[in-house]
Structure formats: structure tokens, C-alpha cells
């Protein structure tokens, strides 16, 4: 039954993106005029490029604790991705035939970042900078007409010169047809994912299109309810089609998390998005045993899996359908 529930949800999401083709066509034909038209329609936004003063004021208003957290994340992400840098290969055989394999950076990349996710920008722009990409364009929508201070700080820290305040399918269309970047990366809702699928071939995209974010959490009686609820809320704020699932053999954990999540929603500025996402795509699953938990996770195939259990070994070597596993 679980796979049927998930399939129905995905089908409903696909039906919502039928207007993407029209948006792409209009932007390709009319340029910024069409971009502004759709921004006004969907976001009440009529300003698609921020001024230097706006960026300065946004960064100036940023909490020092947030700056410290971003700086910490930047250094850690940079250190990790520097380890991924590959070397060129050169081979010469006994007849002096030369074969060379060279790694060259793309000339330009467009990074789509949902309204309030500075971490997504960090995790996309840092590898691009390390690879040697010279031109990076950021597409990041405004929220209620305002820039996101944290994202503007990351953009400045990483040396991004081109920023468009555009979201949804119109942002992908702009990156592909107006900014004309070589490749588009970054997470987004179903409209963004569908737009990236349709422009692929005219512009590069990730090998696996980054659609709505999703997390599945395995918890037991010793798990921290606050940590579980915060993780679910963090994924749900990505968009209304994000999926958050909690699996446990302990009914009390499921009940406590449900109540705790409802209470902490009041503290979030974007509680409307989180609440709608959880109501549409949240799921609490009671499992009778470990095998049922493992089976459920392998059916769900989550982007992110968190094993918040005392004994992780009984799960991690039997789960093969998960993008990343946090222990």
C-alpha cells in the first residue's frame, strides 16, 4: 500500500506542472518581458535584478550568529569538495603515442536557489568555484518583495556578480534563454524540476533532476523528538511538494513528534509552506519490526535518510535505496 500512496502523490504533483511549457515558450520568445509578467502573476514581484544598495542593506541586517554559521559551513564544504578535485591523465605508450584526458571547467553555470535556502547556494557554488567556473548566475526569488539576507551574504562571499530575483519555471527559462548559461543546477519544486527537464539538451542540467526535497527518518524510543521534528520542518520548508516521513516501531514517538511538530510550526516565519507541505506529503509510519522499516525505506527511496536510532548497524547495511544517509 505504501508504494501506491507515494505513486498517487507524485502523480498529483505532475499534474500541477502542465503550464511549464507555456512559460518556457513565452520567455524564449519575449525575454525579460515574459519573466516579469510571470513574476507579477505568481510572486507579485516586478523587480528581477537587485540593486547594489538593496544587497548591501540586506547583508547589513543579517544576524551575526547567522554569519558565523555560514562561515563555518563555507569552510567545511570547501575543504570537503577540494578533496574531489581530479587530476588530468596523460598516457604515452612504447610507440610514443600520446593519449590525454583533461578536465576543463564549464564557462558558465546558473544556480537556482529557493527563497530561503542559503545552504543550497553554498553546496552548489563552492564546487563550481573549485572547478574553475568563471561565470556564475544566481536565480533566487524574493519573499514578499524582499531579498534574503543570508543568500545575499553567501553570494557576496562567493563572488557572484550576476543575480536575478526570479523563481519557478520562469527562472529556469531565464537562465536557459536569457542568461544562456552552459548548465543549470540547484533544487526546486515540481515546476522547477519540470522546466529543467524540458530545457535539457539546449542547456545542461544535473544528471538526476533535483526535484522536491524529501527526508525519511528512522526513530526509536531514545530518539530526540526535537531533532526529528526540526529535520522534518527543515525539509518541508523547501516547498509544498517536499516529502517528510517518520518511521518507528514506537507509537509514542510518532504521537509525540506529531504534537511537537504542530507546536514548533508557530515559531517559523514560513510556517504556511511547512504546514501545507506536511499536510500534503507528511507521513507517520508504524512498523512492527526492523524488517518492515527496512522494506519501507527501500520502497520510499528517499533523497535524505536519517537513522536516529541507538543501533544503526541493523539498518545501514540493509538499506540500498537512499541518496544520503545521516547517522
Language-model regions, residue ranges each:
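Short acidic-hydrophobic, aromatic-tinged amphipathic segments that line or gate anion-handling sites
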Residues: 1, 162-167, 284-289
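Short loop-to-beta-strand entry elements in the cores of soluble alpha/beta enzymes
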Residues: 208-219, 235-258, 274-285, 302-310
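C-terminal core of ALDH-fold dehydrogenases
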Residues: 290, 298-327
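N-terminal Rossmann-like NAD(P)+-binding subdomain of aldehyde/semialdehyde dehydrogenases
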Residues: 1-107
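Glycine-rich phosphate/diphosphate-binding loop of Rossmann-like nucleotide-binding domains
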Residues: 131-146, 220-269
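Conserved small-residue-rich beta-alpha loop and adjacent elements
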Residues: 91-153
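Conserved NAD(P)+-binding/catalytic subdomain of aldehyde/semialdehyde dehydrogenases
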Residues: 159-243
Amino acid at each position: 500500500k505504501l508504494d501506491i500512496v507515494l505513486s498517487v502523490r507524485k502523480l498529483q504533483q505532475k499534474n500541477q506542472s502542465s503550464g511549464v511549457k507555456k512559460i518556457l515558450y513565452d520567455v524564449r520568445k519575449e525575454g525579460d518581458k515574459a519573466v516579469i509578467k510571470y513574476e507579477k502573476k505568481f510572486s507579485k514581484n516586478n523587480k528581477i535584478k537587485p540593486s547594489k544598495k538593496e544587497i548591501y542593506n540586506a547583508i547589513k541586517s543579517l544576524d551575526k550568529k547567522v554569519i558565523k554559521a555560514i562561515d563555518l559551513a563555507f569552510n567545511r564544504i570547501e575543504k570537503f569538495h577540494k578533496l574531489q578535485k581530479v587530476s588530468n591523465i596523460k598516457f604515452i605508450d612504447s610507440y610514443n603515442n600520446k593519449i590525454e584526458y583533461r578536465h576543463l571547467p564549464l564557462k558558465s553555470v546558473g544556480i537556482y536557489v529557493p527563497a530561503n535556502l542559503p545552504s543550497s547556494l553554498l553546496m552548489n557554488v563552492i564546487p563550481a568555484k573549485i572547478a574553475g567556473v568563471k561565470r556564475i548566475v544566481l536565480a533566487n526569488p524574493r519573499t514578499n518583495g524582499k531579498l534574503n539576507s543570508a543568500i545575499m551574504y553567501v553570494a557576496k562571499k562567493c563572488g557572484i556578480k550576476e543575480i536575478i530575483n526570479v523563481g519557478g519555471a520562469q527562472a529556469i527559462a531565464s537562465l536557459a534563454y536569457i542568461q544562456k548559461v552552459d548548465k543549470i543546477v540547484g533544487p526546486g519544486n515540481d515546476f522547477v524540476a519540470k522546466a529543467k527537464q524540458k530545457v535539457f539538451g539546449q542547456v545542461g542540467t544535473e544528471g538526476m533532476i533535483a526535484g522536491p526535497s524529501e527526508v525519511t527518518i528512522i526513530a526509536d524510543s531514545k530518539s530526540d523528538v526535537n531533532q526529528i521534528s526540526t529535520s522534518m520542518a527543515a525539509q518541508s520548508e523547501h516547498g509544498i511538494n517536499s516529502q517528510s516521513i517518520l518511521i518507528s516501531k514506537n507509537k509514542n514517538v510518532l504521537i509525540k513528534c506529531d504534537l511537537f511538530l504542530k507546536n514548533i510550526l508557530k515559531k517559523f516565519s514560513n510556517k504556511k509552506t511547512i504546514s501545507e507541505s506536511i499536510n500534503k506529503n507528511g507521513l507517520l509510519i508504524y512498523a512492527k519490526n526492523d524488517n518492515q522499516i527496512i522494506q519501507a525505506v527501500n520502497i520510499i527511496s528517499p533523497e535524505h535518510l536519517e537513522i536516529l536510532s541507538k543501533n544503526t548497524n541493523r539498518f545501514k547495511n540493509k538499506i540500498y535505496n537512499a541518496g544520503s544517509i545521516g547517522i
